[in-house]
Amino acid sequence: MADGTPRTHRNPQAAQLIEIALSRGEGELTANGALVAKTGERTGRSPNDRFIVKEPSSENDIDWGSVNKPFEQEAFTALWNRVEAYLGDKELFVSELEVGADDAHYQPIQVTTETAWHQLFARNLFIVPEEFNSADKPVWQIINAPGFECVPERDGTHSDATVILNFAERKVLLAGLKYAGEMKKSMFSVQNFLLPAKGVLPMHCSANVGKEGDTTLFFGLSGTGKTTLSADPKRFLIGDDEHGWAPGGVFNIEGGCYAKCIDLSQKNEPVIWNAIRFGTVLENVVMDENRIPDYTNSTLTENSRAAYPLEHIELRKAENRGAEPHAVVFLTCDVSGVLPPVSILTKEQAAYHFLSGYTAKVGSTEMGSSSAIQSTFSTCFGAPFFPRPAGVYAELLMKRIESFGSQVYLVNTGWTGGPHGVGKRFDIPTTRAIVDAIVSGELKGVETEHLEKLNLHVPVAVPGVETQLLNPVNTWADKAQYAEYAQQLADSFTANFEKYQVPDSIKHAGPNA
């Protein structure tokens, strides 16, 4: 500005942010009109750098440990002030946004970023309300300063970067990291703490609605198919990653999608493919010499992403909400090749598998994870984002399933016929056929076969799916080896579940070790 004070852009529009980002060298335009930005060495979340301020109003409700690490209040205040001082002479971008598409349960947020592209990401992923904060709630402050370098000895951080949540002061501080996914996941963690106190279940899931108004939820870790399977050309999308389930309905916590791009194809994922256009942020995607994105190129990371607003999707629920779900799908990526492609779960089995969260890290979103695929147990299908003890969420899930009568299914999007490296992965058309049968209600009350070792009930037929695939033992050439792997998997479930204090009815609902 003329007087030398740096400019602050308030509620800037996408075109303006893209122009500024290009002029400042923050990114480049692709042939399809999207803005490509690179995040440097951190191409995923940094769980070791995430903290929660330990203070009286929330400390007794938080499950402290390796996921939720405590940070001292005084150290937080000093660091927040230091970052504010650092931003004092910078051109800044500020937006008033909301998290939670529900009049009773939204949180108003003010997002301040050092870069134009991070502001574009925030405006794509959070909700841009017609009227900001209509219920006049206290506003959360988010500061994102990727250019600030933390000094662990001075700041009390783990490295040169940090993410810190402060529930008492309603503040989120992101310093020293460019990976934009940290912004959305930090506000997800905030809602995951706040919503259960109101009897609302926060969920790491995607959601869509059929033409008859029937809602389906898809739970799963990154890379298991949440975004791909919910982006269904025959159904209306509510959202692809974060939702709340309140008595009476399901609402999106966000206003956009953050889709994985690795090996993205127009044939298999037309909805996502068509959403990538002007206004979209492509994160760590490599382009060829003609500026055409090469989604097969994982030179920068397996975790390349597209961040776009829900408006980029033609078939969507404009109000970001839906009725309570008739069907709930737990997506698991089984690297051992043991689990069936679909199982029908009882209420107790649903609680067991929700707490277990068995799956694989596929193209993991975490820093430093190798491209090697390994199995993992991630509580509630999203352990890194849930501040309260796991039982709180499992209890809420059972309550909601029971009161509405939702049917829960376990769907394996991983391997069959042998473990990873030997067997083959279920292809997307097979999984889509299973999901089609689930959402149409064709698997309700069907004849099932009980797989004793896994303690799972498997339908004997699914329209559009080869019958031989339904019982996994049929796909293994070596039946004895299958039995061995099934035993190992059952044992690992049992060992993992020992930490949970739950009723026997849930404890005995898992595989038989």
UniProtKB/Swiss-Prot annotation:
Keyword field contains DNA repair: no
Keyword set includes GTP-binding: no
Residues engaged in binding Mn(2+): K185, H204, D241
Annotated metabolic or biological route of this protein: Carbohydrate biosynthesis; gluconeogenesis
UniProt: substrate binding residues: R45, Y179, K185, R305
Gene3D superfamilies: 3.90.228.20, Phosphoenolpyruvate Carboxykinase, domain 1 (3.40.449.10), Phosphoenolpyruvate Carboxykinase, domain 2 (2.170.8.10)
Reactions that this protein is recorded to catalyse: oxaloacetate + ATP = phosphoenolpyruvate + ADP + CO2
GO CC terms: cytosol
Protein name listed in UniProt: Phosphoenolpyruvate carboxykinase (ATP)
EC code: 4.1.1.49
Keywords, ordered alphabetically: ATP-binding, Cytoplasm, Decarboxylase, Gluconeogenesis, Lyase, Manganese, Metal-binding, Nucleotide-binding
UniProt-recorded Gene Ontology molecular function terms: ATP binding; metal ion binding; phosphoenolpyruvate carboxykinase (ATP) activity
